[in-house]
Swiss-Prot record:
Species this protein is from: Neisseria meningitidis serogroup B (strain ATCC BAA-335 / MC58)
GO annotation, cellular component aspect: cytoplasm
Function: Catalyzes the reversible cyclization of carbamoyl aspartate to dihydroorotate.
Cofactor note: Binds 2 Zn(2+) ions per subunit.
EC class name: hydrolase
UniProt KW keywords: Hydrolase, Metal-binding, Pyrimidine biosynthesis, Zinc
Lineage: superkingdom: Bacteria
The protein's name: Dihydroorotase
InterPro entries (UniProt xref): Amidohydro-rel, DHOdimr, Dihydroorotase_CS, Metal_Hydrolase
EC id: 3.5.2.3
Residues found modified as N6-carboxylysine: 98
Record HAMAP family: PyrC_classII
Amino acid sequence: MQTLTIIRPDDMHLHLRDGDALKAVAPYTARQMGRAVIMPNLKPPVVSVADALAYKARIMAALPEGSAFEPLMTLYLTDNATPELVREAKAAGIVAFKLYPAGATTNSDSGVTDLFKLIPVLEEMAKQGILFLVHGEVTDPEIDIFDREAAFIGRVMKPVLAQVPNLKVVFEHITTAEAARLVLEAGDNVAATVTPQHLLLNRNDLLVGGVRPHHFCLPVLKRETHRQALVAAVTGEKAHKFFLGTDSAPHAKSAKENACGCAGMFSAMTAIELYAEVFEKAGALDKLEAFASKNGARFYGIPENTDTITLVKQSQTVPASVPYGDGELVPMRAGGEIGWTVQY
């Protein structure tokens, strides 16, 4: 039977929620990943160092006994951020600030209205070596939802990089050929995370034969040519600029199967297996370890994990749902098969 042993991966973009939801989902990530970069879009958002440290304590309390998993904490960038906050964050071990353009995604109402007013804050991030994580979509209602990432590149990303050229930027959960091209052409201070869904699915998987609410995420799934461009990027000559970030975003089944359903796909349960499928299909299984376990750590300036995990070429059936607080949670590929299984 085919096996693949890799350095334990890290999830560089993860939503863990809070309360009972946190307790339900944290063990899935802790089982596979050594570390994860934790998104700060709680209600209310994680905007201060005190907020982040308190949230980290709640995450640690939700982990299985004996778990070595380490959450890497971030702050939610708001219009009120200051250079002093950046210095405080650095001193407290916060790894990054996250940009949510106001209204772009789940719990983004506190997001930034004009990023260019925060240039002194971004300059301090560059000085302190704190990363700038970007949800790269414009929120202009006149821009089609399928074009919002591409529009963001010209309107925001390129001008910001021109003004703060040494800022370390992660273009999060990229979905388009344009975003991949920006990262490929930018300096080594610019990298990107890519989700399993944007490597495996296209917008037909969302809309053909009926609306598939469990395939609805933001940024929304794009056409097949974009999916192919992402696969080419993560397996190509400059693959070191791309790394694993699931954007696993749990929502109760009732909130997804809804007249106004929430955006987000829960993939943490079988994340590395889904990525293995991508790299296998691309004939690039030898590049999975760098994507999952090396590139992100290098970009964040942290050591690689010292232990390993082993994947076996053995099919598994994903559960139709799993418990989630008072409700249930539908994982990515619920009821379907994945060709790889982690040996636990």
